[in-house]
Each structure stands twice: as C-alpha cells, then as structure tokens.
C-alpha cells in the first residue's frame, strides 16, 4: 500500500525551468507500467455541490487502463521527403513491414503499443471491481476505425467476460455493456450515473477529468492504482496545482482544495487497516473522510468549491484554515 504525491511530466519549458537533462517520460506512466495496474477514479459527492449534468444522481467511477498507449510511446519528428514504416522483427528473424506515410512535407510520427497480458489484467480488474461494487460496467473503444489495436481490447474483454464472468454478473444482477467511445460519451451524459466506465489509458485520462469537473471539481476525485498482485497506490486525481505553488513561493496565501490528497491518505490507511485487520485504523480513515465532508457541508470550503456550492451560508477560506477546520470536525468525531 502506497501514497503518491502529484508529479510533473516535463515539457520544453519545464526542462529549462528545472534544468533537467532530458524530457523525462511521465512518472505516473512509468509507475503504472511497472505495476501493470488499473486506475479507479470516483468523485466525492457532498451536499451543495451539484453536478453540471443535472440528471447525474449517482457517482460514475472511471476505470482507467494504466499501461501503454501514448504514455509509453516512441515519437519522432520527420523531415520532408522521408518515409515512415512500421517494422516488426519476429523471434525467428522474419520481418513484417507496413507503410505509415510518405512525407512530402515535414511532420511527426508516433508508435504506441500494448500487451495482451496487460489488457487481460485490466479486464479482470474491471469485472472484479464491478462485482465488488455491484454496479454495471461499460467499456468503449473505437474498434470500427482501429481494427487491430482497439479491436484487440474489445475481443479480449468479450472473451474474458463470456468465459469467466458472465454467470457471476447474471447472479449479481449487473451487466457488461460495450459500445463505441463516441456513443459511450453521449450515453454517459444522458445517464443518471451509478456505473463503472472502463476506458483505455488516454480515454481514461481525459474522461476522468471531465467526469470529476462535471461532478464539481477535479479536487473532489479519488484515485487508486490496483495491480494484479494486490498492490494499491493512492493519489490525488489532479496534478501539481502549479499556479498555486508559484503563489506559495511568492509568500501569497492560497485557497487550495486538499480533499483529493486527504482522501488519498484515508484510502491508503483504510486499505492498510483492512489488510492488517486493524479496525481502529479503518475507523480513523472513515472518520477523517466524514470530517472533511462535514466541513464542506457546514459551508466552510476552498475557493474552487465556494464558486460551485449552492449552500445558503458558506465562506471561502485559505488552505491552512480549511485543514484546521477539518481537524476540528475530526476531533469532534474521535
């Protein structure tokens, strides 16, 4: 069980700012690839923060595949007149070659990959999580366009569902639903929530932010990476909140929503308690979450939530005051 802080993925500007030797790949992508896990992100719902999508009544959990796609890509800039090809060299030395593009003008090319084993782990993690939560699970790709890459995801999910989970789902009264990613987006917006939406890595990255913001704030989103071996890594779903950090460095007071970071710690403490049979630790995690929610529902919140809240009596406080108020609520519960 681990807790991870927010990290940057450097671009050209960050390379200069932090004097980096190279444009390092995403730290999150690297960790996810090593653990071969699935990221589950779920909004934290509180009274007074109404979803932008008025018909959403229940949380929507995003299950994000944590391996491959653009997060483990290889990409190059291509000069005019060059030819880009996809080359597979097999174990026996034979090769398979496919033309990507003949570049009349300068351009770019990118190679992405995935593994059947990782997709299978992802599928099983999603189906197990759906059974545990007793919620329907949706999965979507663009298999009509990506007839090898995305279609592989669709086929593996269907195979594992039909051979390992269909009878369990029927017994639990839940269902597995597959559709195209664009259709899924439309269906999600029309739904009332209350299901798990399984997404490929990039889709999950984008849609988890959309769902979190539509429910209120990216600062109100839990995130846990679960590996097939039973490793749990909790983190805030948002990034490093760079603008607030720069203000902090200048000595300015910020009003930074720390709920997602707080819930990363409570999630990890609860899981550690569950694994160790430590009931008091689980209880402490539950009460800390309860204290955080009560603080917001009592009208004490950070600036981002203040702008969203429909509570009649509310006030915006700075980061330190917000945490102190949560501590006071926690003391009352302990």
What are these regions (language model features)?
Residues 188-287, 291-297:
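Glycine-rich phosphate/nucleotide-binding loop
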Residues 303, 307-334:
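Phosphate-binding loop/pocket of nucleotide- and phosphate-handling active sites
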Residues 133-141, 165-178, 273-285, 295-308:
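Flexible, glycine/charged-enriched surface loops at secondary-structure junctions
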Residues 26, 40, 49, 55-59, ...:
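Short coil/turn connectors at secondary-structure junctions
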Residues 86-179:
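Glycine-rich phosphate/diphosphate-binding loop of Rossmann-like nucleotide-binding domains
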Residues 1-95, 202, 206:
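N-terminal glycine-rich phosphate/adenylate-binding segment common to multiple enzyme folds
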Residues 13-18, 72-77, 148-153, 188-191, ...:
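Short acidic, glycine/serine/threonine-rich loops at helix termini
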């Amino acid at each position: 069980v681990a807790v991870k802080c927010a990290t940057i993925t450097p671009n050209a500007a960050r390379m200069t700012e932090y004097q980096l030797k190279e444009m390092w790949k995403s730290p999150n992508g690297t960790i996810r690839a090593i653990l071969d896990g699935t990221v589950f992100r779920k909004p934290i719902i509180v009274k007074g923060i109404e979803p932008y999508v008025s018909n959403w009544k229940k949380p929507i959990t995003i299950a994000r595949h944590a391996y491959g796609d653009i997060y483990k890509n290889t990409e190059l800039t291509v000069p005019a007149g060059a030819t880009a090809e996809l080359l597979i060299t097999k174990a026996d030395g034979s090769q398979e070659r496919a033309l990507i593009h003949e570049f009349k003008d300068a351009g770019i090319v990118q190679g992405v990959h995935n593994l059947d084993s990782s997709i299978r782990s992802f599928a099983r993690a999603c189906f197990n999580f759906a059974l545990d939560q007793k919620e329907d699970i949706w999965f979507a790709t663009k298999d009509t366009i990506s007839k090898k890459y995305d279609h592989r995801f669709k086929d593996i999910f269907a195979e594992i569902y039909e051979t390992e989970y269909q009878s369990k789902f029927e017994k639990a009264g839940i269902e597995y639903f597959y559709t195209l990613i664009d259709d899924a987006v439309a269906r999600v917006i029309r739904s009332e929530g209350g299901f798990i939406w399984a997404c490929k890595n990039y889709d999950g990255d984008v849609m988890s932010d959309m769902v979190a913001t539509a429910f209120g704030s990216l600062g109100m989103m839990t995130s846990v990476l679960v590996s097939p071996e039973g490793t749990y890594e909790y983190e805030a779903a948002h990034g490093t909140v760079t603008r607030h950090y720069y203000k902090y460095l200048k000595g300015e007071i910020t009003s930074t929503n720390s709920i997602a970071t707080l819930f990363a710690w409570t999630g990890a403490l609860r899981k550690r308690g569950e694994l160790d049979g430590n009931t008091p630790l689980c209880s402490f995690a539950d009460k800390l979450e309860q204290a955080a929610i009560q603080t917001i529902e009592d009208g004490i919140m950070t600036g981002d939530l203040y702008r969203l809240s429909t509570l009649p009596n509310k006030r915006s406080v700075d980061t330190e005051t917000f945490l102190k108020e949560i501590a006071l609520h926690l003391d009352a519960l302990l």
